[in-house]
Structures are given as structure tokens and as C-alpha cells.
């Protein structure tokens, strides 16, 4: 049963991550929030029509509700009176709140719990089983497996169109593609994924899996195909590690998965080879050291033939004349010596030919 839970978690994670990459790149990540919270209204309305949650009608209603939330948010944005993030924030609470009211008033005896919709319970997902080609499989695994296969098929067929419309809608239009149609197709795929996943992992975890792994993958690569692969791997790692963490601490599985997704993002944010905080700090430190070496070369070149050379070019006086701390001055001198920019002559620091060239090239100092 644990293996089935792991499989469900991986399938859901990969499906959410694939959709999330395009949401992150299009800067509409919160649209997943709007869709995942709006589905409860569609489920309730679908139940009113079919009088059962086991039919296909609530699923279709949830997908339609997700698309309606996207359309309403875009219509609000096009008025020019509210921005895109505010439009999303206006639409989904209203639809979610209306769904909760309808559940409490007219569907109180229905097995539809708002806590389960938000948080899910993936640990119990294998208990709901269906027969699939003579195999007894968890319904969630079959459902999300079908969604994932559909997403992979759509990516294979329309990868070029999605890529061009995401990065350059004007070029897509000139090539005969419809960015609007592609956008609504993407939103339909996101809606189906959210509806399929919320029953297993809940709306909150769907949001975390759609935003966090793709955002981390974006810090690791600029290649779209590689980004899709990395986002899927990161989402799978977050789900698996979160699942075992929840078992270890006997806590919420959805909460542990979301936490591990955040931990993985934090690690990538800190240690990404290209965009990580540590990398940027090291680059800034190196640039600052390069600038200090140039400053030292200019200072020594300026006073090379002056009567104050014995003072201005003395290493012990750098803290006074260049306003450096003793530690910083020592580090700059070590670097300049290692690079062959200066030489020690007793207590003095004198420029080498390479140091003179550096001063002339960078600041046009006449020496």
C-alpha cells in the first residue's frame, strides 16, 4: 500500500509540475490557486445535476468552474481597473466561498468535506480502487495516470506552439498560431489536472506542486525541455521525501510534502550554480576584489614618481590613504601579488609592467 501511495504522489507531482512550468514562465502562477479553489463550486453544481459524486458530471462541472475562474479573472484584468494578481484574488475567494455556502446549505449530507478538498488525504487514496485491465488499482492512480499521459501527449504534439506563445506571443501570431487559444488550452489542462489531483492531495498541495518545483527548475536552467524534466524530478523528490517525513513524524502528508517542496526550493535558491544566492555572493565578492585591485593599481600609479611615494606606496599606509581596513588591504595586496600586478621592494609596493598596463587600460592614468 505504501508503494501505491508513492506512485500516486509521483504521478500527481509530475502532472502538476508539467503544467506549472508554463504558468511560472507566463507569470500567472496564482492562476493555479484560482482554479484549484474554484473547483468545489463546480463539484457542488455537478452534484445538484447528477445527485451523485461518483458520476462524471461533477468532474466536468469542476473543470468548467476552473475555466470560468480564468475567464472572469481575465475579464476583470481587461477592464484596466484591477491588475492581474488582484483579479485572481477577487475571483477565486468568491467562487470558493459560494461553493462552501452551497455545500453547507444544500449538501450537508453529502460526502464532500471542504477540509478534504483543501488538504486531501493521499494516505487513504489506495482504498478507493477500480478494476483496470483485470488489475485492481487505486482510482486516483488510474485517474491521474490518464491525466499525465494526456499532458505528455499534448506536450509532444504542441511543444513548439506552447514554447513560442509563452516567450513571444507576437511571433506566435505572425506564424499563424493563436496565443489566446493556446492559453485557454493550457488553462483547460491545468483545470483538469487540478480537478484530478485535488481528490488525492488537496488544493493546497496542488498549488505547492505547480509553483515550487517549476520555480526551482527556473533557477537551474534556461532550457525549456530541461526545465520540464527538472521540475518533474524536483516535484517527485518533494513528494516522496515528504511522504516518508510524514510517516516518520506521524504528521500531515500534504503538509510534509509542501514543506519538502519549500526545502528543495530553498536549497536551489541558495546553491543554484547560475542564479543561487551563494553563487551571486561569490561573484560579487570577486568583482569587488577585482575593483580593489584596480584601485590599488591606480593609487600606486598615481604616486609612482611623486615625493610622497615612500608613504603613499607603503603597504602599511594603505588603510589611511585608500580607506581600507587592515584585513581588506592585506587581501587586496595578496591578490595583486598573486596576479603579478605589484612587487614588494622593502616596505614599498611597486607596479609591474602588467600593473601599469592595468592602470592605463582601466582608468587611462598617465604613468
From Swiss-Prot:
| Record keywords, A-Z | Cell membrane, Ion transport, Membrane, Transmembrane, Transmembrane helix, Transport, Zinc, Zinc transport
Q: Where are the transmembrane segments?
A: 5-25, 28-48, 56-76, 87-107, 140-160, 170-190, 201-221, 224-244, 251-271
Disulfide bond is among the record's keywords: no
Primary residence:
membrane
* Family the entry assigns: Belongs to the ABC-3 integral membrane protein family.
- What topology in the membrane does the UniProt record assign? Multi-pass membrane protein
Gene3D superfamilies for the chain: ABC transporter involved in vitamin B12 uptake, BtuC
Summary of the function given for this chain in its UniProt record: Part of an ATP-driven transport system TroABCD for zinc.
Q: Where in the cell is it found?
A: Cell membrane
- Protein name (record): Zinc transport system membrane protein TroD
Q: Which GO terms describe its biological process?
A: response to zinc ion; transmembrane transport; zinc ion transport
> What InterPro entries does the entry give?
ABC_BtuC-like (IPR037294), ABC_TroCD (IPR001626)
SUPFAM superfamilies found in the cross-reference section: ABC transporter involved in vitamin B12 uptake, BtuC
The cellular component terms of Gene Ontology attached to this UniProt record, alphabetical and capped at eight, are: ATP-binding cassette (ABC) transporter complex
